[in-house]
Every structure is written in structure tokens, then in C-alpha cells.
């Protein structure tokens, strides 16, 4: 179990996020981190995943890829970029009500849903046009089992643009999962990028992300 009491006495950082083991850990961590997450993490670490995932979405999306589901929406980093690009029908889903409160204040989402995506997602079958995610499929957060529910709620032909931490891509079964669902998805395109740009912390600079881009088969 994550020791969140000690976190109250020190600044929360990336190592704390990587220490997560259960959904309950995530709820506790982001409850304490929500109000300062953007400044403490996204800005200070020059976090690139929201920008990269939004770039790949814009590159591969069609007009029919709507509504967009932002998985692990957090404080709304991806939603903000997509909204600024003209997207208006964006649904944000996250396990942390405190993070969603921050996203709500920014006003970039048409709908916000508090849910654990490792369980049944409270959205209808074939109701989502595209799924994007930055920073959710990583150490101690969400594993590949979530793709079954995400495919259920996505329309046939719907676009997926998902960031996966490279260190867990094989170890945690993401590669195997894509092979197992190859009858349900198009051949994925994989693009690697740095999670953090030109950061003075060597550990941050070594974090690699795999953008996984595919569509649900018709």
C-alpha cells in the first residue's frame, strides 16, 4: 500500500506515481496532488505526452472520430490541447474526483466521468468515436485488460491513440494483448518519444513512451 501520509510532508513527484500498485493508491495519490499537479509535474518536468498524443490524434483522425474519450484525463492536459485545436465533444474519464475537479474548472470537456476503467465503464456500447490517453498506461496505473472495455464502448472504425510507457509495454503484457485482439483492431502503428523534453533530471530524460495508434475494426 502506498504511504500517502509521508507525501503530505514532502513534495509529490514522479517516483511517487511510479510507486502506485492499486486503484486505491491512485485515488489517494491524486487526491493530494490534484491542485498542484500541473505546476509540480507537467510544467516542471517539461511533460510531453499530452502534446505528442494530441499531435498523433490530429494526424490520424477523421471528422467522424467523435466524441473523443480522454482516458485518465486528470487535470485536462490533453483536453486543453484538443479543445484549442477545435475539438468540442470531449469526454474525460478518471478515477480521481479531485483531478476531475481541476479539469472541470478549465472547461474543455463536454462530459466528465469518475470511473475505474479496469472495471465496467459506465458508457454505452459503440458510443465513443475515438480514445486518447496520455500517462495512464504506465507503472502501477492501468494494465492491458482495460482495452476490452474500451473496445466495447468504441464505435466500429473508432480511432485509438494511446501512450504506453516503454518499460511496461512487454513486461506488463501490452504487446501480447495487441496480438490477442488483432481480430478486433487494425495493425497498430507504434511511435516512440521522450516523455520529458530536455530535463535536467537524467531519470526524466530516460523515460520513453510508445504511442500506439490503431482503429477498432469495422
PLM region spans:
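A short glycine-rich, Lys/Arg-flanked "PGG" loop and its adjoining helix->strand segment in the class I
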Residues: 145-156
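Conserved alpha-helix/loop element of class I SAM-dependent methyltransferases that forms part
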Residues: 47-64
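Conserved beta-strand signature within the Rossmann-like core of class I S-adenosyl-L-methionine
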Residues: 157-165
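Conserved Class I S-adenosyl-L-methionine
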Residues: 172-194
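A short acidic, Gly/Pro-enriched loop at the edge of an enzyme's catalytic core
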Residues: 121-131
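Class I SAM-dependent methyltransferase SAM/SAH-binding core
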Residues: 69-120
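N-terminal auxiliary segments of SAM/dcSAM-dependent transferases
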Residues: 2-24
